[in-house]
Amino acid sequence: MADFIQLKKDNILKIGIKDIEGNDTGEHLEFDMEDIELPLRLNECEARHRKNLEFLKMQFVIIDKKEDKKGKFILSWKEEEKLKILQEFYKREMEALDLFLGQNGTNKLLNGRKPYYSMYEDINDMLVPILPKLKLKADDIANKIKEKYSNKATEKNVLE
């Protein structure tokens, strides 16, 4: 019989996800509150969101400067191109959000809904209640590190 070891799962924040009617979906997001990279990933998520918005605006300007043509079917060439750019924008937004939410976290929150323009802001609004917890944990971790190593430094000085 093999022996096993397992790390403690302290300070894991689990957030359940509900559908539009308020029913529990059984899905949840997990955040390791002692992960020092979590606030950094949140910052990177915000930076990517801003880059994505800039990308979308620039692409729309480029498309608008070109002459419109008749499309293959109902939509004009410009309309088709703008929709393709929007699809790319949504893909980039989901990748940015997944940096913080974890793999497929955005899909869990969308709960079957397709990505949409204000998705980032809506998800950000949902996460506002946990953001102070992240800051407190980041400060707490920094204080624990200071405390741990400052005590060793003073003990070392006392022993000398």
Regions found by a protein language model. Name each.
Residues 94-160:
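C-terminal charged interaction modules
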Residues 85-88, 101:
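Ordered, amphipathic secondary-structure segments that act as subunit-interaction surfaces
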Residues 45-84:
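Mixed-charge, low-complexity intrinsically disordered segments
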Residues 76-78, 83-85, 126-128, 133-134:
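Short leucine-rich amphipathic alpha-helices used at interfaces
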